[in-house]
Amino acid sequence: MRIGHGFDVHAFGGEGPIIIGGVRIPYEKGLLAHSDGDVALHALTDALLGAAALGDIGKLFPDTDPAFKGADSRELLREAWRRIQAKGYALGNVDVTIIAQAPKMLPHIPQMRVFIAEDLGCHMDDVNVKATTTEKLGFTGRGEGIACEAVALLIKATK
């Protein structure tokens, strides 16, 4: 078994909506990013890549490459997952924690789980997504941006 941890953060800027966990969420602010700014899928992709010792999302999909400008993070996750499977790993489970004062994530979490399970080809029981605030402390608490942490467990695939 191998464990990976991922973290991502994006500042608010411009107009919404935002995309978190593959879900388009109405919000007056957008997220500043080279891709679609999906902090949940970026953190998850990093956790999976880390568990497989395949580097990180910035190495695979550099923000200096114009090909990834505005990229759909679900596509990036699926490509990373293909590489991880090619290395002989299967999914144990993933756990994602979104850190945001606003907007409220709870109504969107079921669809996030559906999208992540689809992208990883796994059962929804293998995907957990939750959200928390920082009780108005720090940059997320002041409403300056959104952060996310993710943990992934990989197991050697059986043939």
Curated annotation (Swiss-Prot):
Pathway: Isoprenoid biosynthesis; isopentenyl diphosphate biosynthesis via DXP pathway; isopentenyl diphosphate from 1-deoxy-D-xylulose 5-phosphate: step 4/6. 4-CDP-2-C-methyl-D-erythritol 2-phosphate binds at residues 8-10, 34-35, 56-58, 61-65, 100-106, 132-135, 139, 142. Its cofactor is a divalent metal cation. Homotrimer. InterPro entries: MECDP_synthase, MECDP_synthase_CS, MECDP_synthase_sf. The keyword Transmembrane does not apply. The record marks 34, 133 as: Transition state stabilizer. It is an enzyme of class 4 (lyase). Gene3D superfamilies: 2-C-methyl-D-erythritol 2,4-cyclodiphosphate synthase (3.30.1330.50). Binds 1 divalent metal cation per subunit. It catalyses: 4-CDP-2-C-methyl-D-erythritol 2-phosphate = 2-C-methyl-D-erythritol 2,4-cyclic diphosphate + CMP. A divalent metal cation binds at residues 8, 10, 42. One of its GO terms (biological process) is isopentenyl diphosphate biosynthetic process, methylerythritol 4-phosphate pathway. The keyword Cell membrane does not apply. Belongs to the IspF family. Transmembrane segments: none annotated. This is 2-C-methyl-D-erythritol 2,4-cyclodiphosphate synthase. Involved in the biosynthesis of isopentenyl diphosphate (IPP) and dimethylallyl diphosphate (DMAPP), two major building blocks of isoprenoid compounds. Catalyzes the conversion of 4-diphosphocytidyl-2-C-methyl-D-erythritol 2-phosphate (CDP-ME2P) to 2-C-methyl-D-erythritol 2,4-cyclodiphosphate (ME-CPP) with a corresponding release of cytidine 5-monophosphate (CMP). Keywords: Isoprene biosynthesis, Lyase, Metal-binding. It comes from the Bacteria. PROSITE patterns: ISPF. GO terms for molecular function: 2-C-methyl-D-erythritol 2,4-cyclodiphosphate synthase activity; metal ion binding. Its EC number is 4.6.1.12.
